[in-house]
């Protein structure tokens, strides 16, 4: 599967940019990435601090299959893949706090936030990973 990678140095939010990208008909699937977010949001729309060049801020955009259980599976899959990658690549003690929070040495460092937006593109899924 071929992905489009769209990288920015600074965005208000990768989620906002992903919605704009999908509504303008950008090729899917696509990964929208930023080195910094000035208005990132977490669960329940809470503000999310995104400092310069110290994190991974991204939103994955793809056509959603008709599957009611997809969001829970994506949430779990993103968390497991993130933790396994952190452990393997960096040798750090990463853990999952059910179901979407990723902890390093007892402190929350990331979360996955699958969400669904119909936008103007029918059946488009926006999924913020980590």
Please give the residue ranges for each predicted region.
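N-terminal lobe of the biotin/lipoate ligase/transferase fold
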Residues: 1-89, 110, 124
């Amino acid at each position: 599967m071929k992905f489009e990678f769209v990288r920015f140095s600074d965005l208000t939010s990768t989620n906002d940019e992903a919605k704009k990208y999908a509504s303008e008909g950008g090729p899917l699937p696509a990964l929208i990435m930023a080195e910094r977010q000035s208005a990132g949001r977490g669960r329940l729309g809470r503000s999310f601090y995104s400092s310069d060049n110290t994190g991974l801020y991204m939103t994955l955009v793809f056509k959603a299959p008709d599957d009611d259980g997809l969001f829970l599976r994506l949430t779990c899959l993103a968390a497991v893949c993130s933790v396994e990658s952190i452990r393997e690549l960096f040798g750090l003690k990463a853990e999952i706090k059910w179901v979407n929070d990723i902890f390093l040495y007892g402190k929350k460092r990331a979360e996955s936030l699958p969400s669904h937006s119909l936008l103007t593109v029918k059946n488009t899924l926006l999924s913020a990973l980590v």
